[in-house]
Amino acid sequence: MPLRFDQLDHKEFQDCTSVGMTEHEVIELAQAFRLYGFWSINLDTGLFLATPDVYRIFDMQSEDGRMNLVEFREHIHPDDLPILMECFERCSSQKQSYHMIYRVKRGADWKFVRTVGKFREKPGTSGEIVGITYEFFERLRTAAFTDGDD
């Protein structure tokens, strides 16, 4: 399967309030027709927190919002896992944003999901990576990074 690296130019922030929408409405629309979850990884402790849709995407049981990284990795296609781990590494070490489209186990088949993440400063710590993951229906693995200048 082909892999494409994208160069991202900084996008202008799209303010939903400029068209009369609230942030809640934006999230409601994003989640309306697909699984769409939020997550964070504390870089000092490794604590990986996720919302229920992330658990549903990975066909995992949600107990207290703490994602089991070992189980999480078992659900990712073995060809895609090293690239996803590189995304996490580059994001945290170079304070970048990234996106990646990759395959997740669904029964005997694989489905595509997209993860978008970014490094976030957290005072007194090494920071954290925060992001979203949602079902994706294109059939191309891809990864992209920004230069970190916000």
Task: For each feature predicted by the language model, list its residue ranges.
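Short, positively charged
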Residues: E12-T22, L81-I83
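PAS-family sensory domains
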Residues: P2-C16, Y55-D147
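Acidic active-site catalytic centers that drive phospho-/nucleotidyl reactions
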Residues: N42, D80, E135
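Active-site-proximal flexible loops/turns
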Residues: L49, E86, P123, R139-T142
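Short, charged helix-to-loop "capping" segments that act as catalytic/coupling loops
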Residues: N42, G107-D109, R139
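PAS-family sensory domain signal
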Residues: S18-R73, F112, K118, A144-D150
